[in-house]
Amino acid sequence: MQFMLLFSRQGKLRLQKWYVPLSDKEKKKITRELVQTVLARKPKMCSFLEWRDLKIVYKRYASLYFCCAIEDQDNELITLEIIHRYVELLDKYFGSVCELDIIFNFEKAYFILDEFLLGGEVQETSKKNVLKAIEQADLLQEDAKEAETPRSVLEEIGLT
């Protein structure tokens, strides 16, 4: 996989993950071009399209489009399944994920993606293992926040 983009029906980019080195200018150009291309397609059209020397695989879930660019020899159906698995992981974590979950918890959406995909390839096929890793990271984060909470001198010596 070269990259994954999540964008709304209005064309607003919500998440982007690039697995190939490109300049910011090139990324913006690609994003703009692909968003326009995908949004212009009719709902009954095929979810695969040839674009430049890549294949684009996309799927719409509610108000979000999940769009991936893959190499010519990669399998479109597996990519569609990868998109679906990512949506399932988001659903499990957020409990029926919506666009607002992605907007306000984008770092979690990226973290889930990073636990699932590594370098554009599936790292972990088990939803259970991915969710367990995310729960453990959440616990670590909570523990770190508790450790940062300043305590009074009386609490330190056990007088409260």
Curated annotation (Swiss-Prot):
Annotated GO biological process: adipose tissue development; establishment of localization in cell; fat cell differentiation; intracellular protein transport; melanosome assembly; neuromuscular process controlling balance; platelet dense granule organization; synaptic vesicle budding from endosome
Any one GO molecular-function label of the UniProt entry: clathrin adaptor activity
CDD domains for the chain: AP1_sigma
Top-rank lineage group of the source organism: Eukaryota
Compartments in which it is found: Golgi apparatus; Cytoplasmic vesicle membrane; Membrane, Clathrin-coated pit
Functional note: Subunit of clathrin-associated adaptor protein complex 1 that plays a role in protein sorting in the late-Golgi/trans-Golgi network (TGN) and/or endosomes. The AP complexes mediate both the recruitment of clathrin to membranes and the recognition of sorting signals within the cytosolic tails of transmembrane cargo molecules.
PANTHER family: ADAPTOR COMPLEXES SMALL SUBUNIT FAMILY
Organism: Mus musculus
Gene this chain is encoded by: Ap1s2
Keyword annotations from UniProtKB, A to Z: Coated pit, Cytoplasmic vesicle, Golgi apparatus, Membrane, Protein transport, Transport
Membrane topology: Peripheral membrane protein
Protein name: AP-1 complex subunit sigma-2
Record-level GO cellular component terms: AP-1 adaptor complex; clathrin-coated pit; early endosome; lysosomal membrane; presynapse; trans-Golgi network membrane
Principal location listed in the UniProt entry: Golgi
